[in-house]
A protein has these predicted regions:
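Vicinal oxygen chelate
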Residues: 7-15, 41-44, 57-143, ...
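A short, sequence-level motif marking secondary-structure junctions
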Residues: 55-59, 107-109
C-alpha cells in the first residue's frame, strides 16, 4: 500500500507574479527561484517550493491556510505586516491576494529537513526545541 511521504509544493494564486515576488522579498529579502514563466514563479525552499500562479479571481479565504515554516517567526510576522499583510492573530496573516498564511518556527515543529538540505539553504545549525524533539521521539523519529 503506498504512503504519502510529504508535500513537494503548494500552489498559491496571486494577482501578478511581479507584485507577489516583491511582497515576499519585502518579507524574506531576495528569494531564490526554481523557475519563472509569464504566469508562474517557483520560490525555492530547499527540497520543496511554493508555486505562485498569476490571476487569482476568487475572494479571500481565511478558512484554509498554508503553514509556512521559518527560522524567525516574530521577524517574519513583523515584516509581513510592514509589507502590507493583514494580521489575523499572533501567528497568521492574509497576503494582498487573500491567501491565509500561518507562520511557525522551525525549531518548534516536528517537520525536519536533513542537515545537508539545511546547509544548502544557508541554515546549517538550525536547531529543534526540546518540545519538538520530544514529539519526534514519541514517534520513534528522534534519539
Amino acid at each position: 500500500m503506498p504512503r504519502p511521504v510529504g508535500i513537494n509544493h503548494v500552489a498559491v494564486e496571486v494577482g501578478s507574479i511581479d507584485d507577489a515576488l516583491r511582497f515576499f522579498e519585502e518579507i524574506f529579502g531576495e528569494v531564490e527561484l526554481r523557475g519563472r514563466s509569464g504566469s508562474m514563479a517557483f520560490i525555492d525552499l530547499g527540497d520543496q517550493f511554493i508555486a505562485l500562479s498569476a490571476g487569482r479571481s476568487q475572494p479571500a479565504d481565511e478558512a484554509r491556510h498554508i503553514g509556512l515554516v521559518v527560522d524567525g517567526r516574530e521577524e517574519t510576522l513583523a515584516r509581513a505586516k510592514a509589507a502590507g499583510a493583514r494580521m489575523l492573530d499572533d501567528n497568521d496573516f492574509v497576503d494582498p491576494w487573500g491567501n491565509h498564511w500561518q507562520v511557525v518556527d522551525y525549531r518548534d515543529i516536528q517537520f525536519t529537513k536533513t542537515p545537508r538540505i539545511l546547509e544548502g539553504m544557508g541554515l546549517a545549525g538550525l536547531e529543534k526545541s526540546d518540545r519538538a524533539i520530544a514529539e519526534l521521539r514519541t514517534k520513534g523519529l528522534a534519539d
